[in-house]
UniProtKB/Swiss-Prot annotation:
The active site is at 126 (proton donor). The keyword Lyase does not apply. Belongs to the IspH family. One of its GO terms (molecular function) is 4 iron, 4 sulfur cluster binding. Transmembrane segments: none annotated. GO terms for biological process: dimethylallyl diphosphate biosynthetic process; isopentenyl diphosphate biosynthetic process, methylerythritol 4-phosphate pathway; terpenoid biosynthetic process. It comes from Pseudomonas savastanoi pv. phaseolicola (strain 1448A / Race 6) (Pseudomonas syringae pv. phaseolicola (strain 1448A / Race 6)). [4Fe-4S] cluster binds at residues 12, 96, 198. This is 4-hydroxy-3-methylbut-2-enyl diphosphate reductase. Its EC number is 1.17.7.4. Keywords: 4Fe-4S, Iron, Iron-sulfur, Isoprene biosynthesis, Metal-binding, Oxidoreductase. Binds 1 [4Fe-4S] cluster per subunit. (2E)-4-hydroxy-3-methylbut-2-enyl diphosphate binds at residues 41, 74, 124, 168, 226-228, 270.
């Protein structure tokens, strides 16, 4: 059995920044540091930060007064920001800047009283945060659609004053079809020059397609609640390549690889490389050879840290 590695894979700039914000806050201020929602959707990362003093909560009413709270990479609604400010909580915002970009778009449509459609998965924290940027008091409304069927049944007030945005971690292929359906049903709809799916999501989806084309089975390292990791598994399966989403080497079954010659490995944007290395080691113990990395798109994007953490870390 030969191992092939997708390129790029694993951490993106937004995830790197979010994890580093929690790490720096722990270093500068000491534990406990409260984090609203899992800072990124990865079990290994969350447990590591928890072991060092991060406390993960789902709502601010679980946060005591006079502590530091960090908003996760997925972003939060304006109502959550207002609640935190009203309580005087010290907040560090780990929202991915590419998610913030979508928030700004939604807020602009809201101010203009323009109806907005969000393409995304119901219940995902990024979707909840993005929906929560819209203030309907200006006369508009925001709607959530997941697929073409939702578009077909959607009723809006003013189809001539309509715009769309997208969740950043969707399948590019699925999203393209939904956008086409929106444009067909609402010809006057506006939106970003291109969809809001982030560069890292696009790159990892392109890479897993190449991987699935060259391999007999694909392993996606990522947690079950990771949207982008699930999309990677789905893409491989759509190419008729068996694919498995695993948190790490302990989730693998040796029987998956009977008769397999080429094993492909990728990782979601919130999965650290140490987990990939663990998977490789286990496969090699089962007789796999090599770990050849495919050619791929280079990523050199970085996002800046909050000023207070950036300055204090240098003192």
């Amino acid at each position: 059995m030969q191992i092939k590695l997708a390129n790029p894979r694993g951490f993106c700039a937004g995830v790197d920044r979010a994890i580093e914000i929690v790490n720096r806050a722990l270093e500068v201020f000491g534990p406990p540091i409260y984090v609203r929602h899992e800072v990124v959707h990865n079990k290994f990362v969350v447990e590591d930060l928890r072991s060092r003093g991060a406390i993960f909560v789902e709502e601010l009413d679980q946060v005591p007064d006079d502590v530091i709270v960090i908003f996760s990479a997925h972003g939060v609604s304006q109502a959550v920001r207002t609640e935190a400010a009203g309580r005087g909580l010290k907040v560090f915002d780990a929202t991915c800047p590419l998610v913030t970009k979508v928030h700004i778009e939604v807020a602009r449509y809201s101010r203009d009283g323009r109806e907005c459609i969000l393409i995304g998965h119901a219940g995902h924290p990024e979707v909840e945060g993005t929906m929560g940027q819209y203030d309907a008091s200006n006369g508009g409304a925001i709607y959530l659609v997941e697929d073409e069927e939702d578009v077909a049944s959607l009723q809006v007030r003013n189809p001539d004053s309509l715009a769309f945005v997208t969740q950043t971690t969707l399948s590019m292929d699925d999203t393209s079809r939904v956008i086409d359906a929106l444009r067909k049903r609402f010809p006057a709809i506006g939106g970003p020059r291109k969809d809001d799916i982030c560069y890292a999501t696009q790159n990892r989806q392109d890479a897993v397609k190449q991987l699935a084309d060259e391999c007999d089975v694909v392993l996606v390292v990522g947690s079950p609640n990771s949207s982008n990791s699930n999309r990677l598994r789905e893409l491989a399966e759509r190419m008729a390549t068996p694919a498995y989403l695993i948190d790490g080497a302990e989730d693998m079954q040796q029987g998956w690889f009977e008769g397999v010659e080429r094993i492909g490995i990728t990782a979601g944007a919130s999965a650290p490389e140490v987990l990939v290395r663990g998977v490789i080691q286990q496969l090699q113990a089962w007789g796999a050879t090599g770990a050849d990395e495919l050619a791929g798109r280079e990523e050199n994007i970085t996002f800046s840290m909050p000023k207070e953490l950036r300055v204090k870390s240098l003192l």
